[in-house]
Amino acid sequence: MLRVKNLYKSFGGIRAINNITLEIEKSSITALIGPNGAGKTTLFNIINGSIKPDSGTVELNEIDITGYEPHQLFNLGILRTFQVAHEFSSLTVKDNLMMVPPNQTGESILQTWFSPKKIKLEEQNITRKADEVMEFLQLKHLANEYAGNLSGGQKKLLELGRTMMVDPKIVLLDEVGAGVNRTLLNTIGDAILRLNKEFHYTFCMIEHDIEFISRLCDPVIVMAEGSILMKDKISKVKENDKVIEVYLGKN
């Protein structure tokens, strides 16, 4: 589904991505792990168009999308969440969700004059979708709460909900567990598993919480110094001597 081939990226002479080739299979939950500086975030930034690779390609369903801008990739169904949630703090939870679908008819001044019925129907559909998302993520009771007042874990749930508003092809989750208590992290994990099993969502996540990864992810890709060290089940990864060395050192 998503394929990265022979990818290179350097910053000031330091090679952050070194000849990476990998595939993210459709309807999988793939974890991307490795020590700080391994190149995980740089790889995400290339996939979602935030930065351009020096060479190599990124393909979605065998279509070369290398160099596409983030908004173009959004329209193709590649969505990303961040380690620090990017909510619109002065808008309510529900409004945060409703503003996600692109190219809404009501955004055009002319359409407000000439297509009021179309706008009303579209808004009803988006409202219905937002209500379904909030129900799914157990956020319905916070519909009218300003997003800036949410806890860290609730903001992560809201970000996940924003991706659900457009039925994505792949969701890139950047440390969804960072700063989240275990109860809310379990809720997030439950939602990810349901989206994967019931709606066949594809996820790729950068994550450090091994317990969380063990529950959700197969396969696990290990990165070190800008390269792929291995790709396997988490049980195999935890037993691998090279992985242990990368995380804990030779001694």
Regions inferred by a protein language model and the residue ranges of each:
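Conserved ABC transporter NBD signature motif
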Residues: G56-I63, L76
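Walker B catalytic motif
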Residues: E175-V176
